[in-house]
Amino acid sequence: TIRLVGTQAGAVTDLDGNFELNGVGVLEGMYDIEVKYVGYKTEVRRKVRVENGNLVILNLELETDAQELADVVVVAKKNRENENMLLLEQQKAVIAVQAVGVKELSRKGVSDAEGAVSKVAGVSKQEGVKNVFVRGLGDRYNATTFNGFPIPSEDPEYKNISLDFFSTDIIQTVGVNKAFNAGGSSDVGGANIDITSKELIGGGHFNIGVSGGFNTQTLTTDFLKMDGVNLLGIADKTQPGMENNYNFKNSLDPSEHDLQINRNYGVSGGKRFYVGPQKDALSFFLVAAHNTEYQYAEEVLRNTTTNGTIYKDQTGKVYEQKISQLALANLDYDYRNRHHLSYNFMMVHDNVQSVGDYDGMDSGKFNDDYDNMGFTRRQQANDNWLLVNQLMTNWGLTKTLSFDAGASYNVVKGSEPDRRINNLRKAAEGYTLLEGNSQQRYFSELNENDLNVKAGLTYRLADDQEEISNIRIGYNGRFVNDDFEATEYNMTVAHSSVFRLEDFSLDSYYNQENLKNGWFEIQRNVDKYTVKKDIHSAYVEAVYQFDAAWILNLGVKYDRVD
């Protein structure tokens, strides 16, 4: 291109480099003429005089603009949310791992990690049973990890944390490893389920989501809610503490509500920066979400003896509300594309509260002259918190030697604050409170502190195949402290009132005045336990690929459990 500097006049040469400038915009005077072409240095001819009516001929020769690059580095971050990337990883993996990415989960309408693993072959979910079965093996034979670190359970009866704790808002992938390897957990017979948290993909991200919905069952029903749980799902855990005072803070009578709307709010965002003279990548990613949903179900409970005799036949109505909040933060730093440092923080709060009313025959409980008929009301809230802090690093020491290390500190608080169970038997005039330990309030709390550390040194071996051969030596440590306390208040009936199921109030009976008058008594029982667990694991593992069809994986591991 040819241009008169300081004007809009210009032209483009033909294939032989010839050009002509004339017409509007070219006036008499002195001009600097600029010549540009791809692959050549820009040439400027100074002080060329242009006169009216005279032809000016210029012969210009451009110099080649040749530059030699020492090297070209293309930096890319793989997107493990994508199904194709996960399939490529599984194809090249030495240990068979099945993984599901968040894009596939979104397409299939899956909302949490429990639903994700149910999509994997050999994994099943049984209604009414917590967590999943892998090849028929339940909770005891499986293990759960988060970004490769073990994570404790929020329930003292279970080894693994409930997978529905983890919504797809914070999941990048869910992997299921059914094969044993030296670097993994030794306490696994079914599978290790690893949940990988989200991280920033690309240069930047920002998203706000709001959704709502309703369940037709909850819209047309007077929805019952238990007392003692606020709008954020935080339960009141206050106990009376003394047997001679009835000062429970929460009511025994649930409240009625209508027009229950499911709602979900979420925001996520992140940004990638390049810092320092080497333009090292520094990124952060944040997620926060709140969810509230309602469910209503009508149930039939029927139990029989071995010879087919029915001893329990009840119908029930269950009102359930689930409230959860989550927050995720990820900070990631790459130094010269060889050293990697990352920090992950996650907070999950999950509250499930339910009111269940069951009416009918139960000869094991209501054993009397009125056809063993009775009524049971069960009010329960499970209020759980999970805090996770993880620091991980990976260093490329040489072209063949790398070092990785990490630490994770988890805090779990699982509580069942003020579970209320009341049983009423059918009588001639209506219903009366059942004697014995049938009227109960129960408080429990589990506090678990879990520290995990790991380190490994990997030496890459040369082979003629895909260069996956290596020798690895490593250490894993886990140090757990559990404290559990359960307090049970049995409110034994001495003189019962008569109730009608249509409009009965238990608060009218259970109060300080009736306790003082001897209508009922309170017995308080406390159970506690403390567990300390230290696990040290050291291992050596070797992988060598002989050809495209043969790979050797050999490992030795030592575990010490105190």
Located regions from the model:
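Flexible, surface-exposed loop regions and adjacent strand-edge segments
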Residues: 50, 89-91, 224-229, 298-309, ...
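Face-selective signature of the C-terminal outer-membrane beta-barrel domain
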Residues: 334-348, 380-562
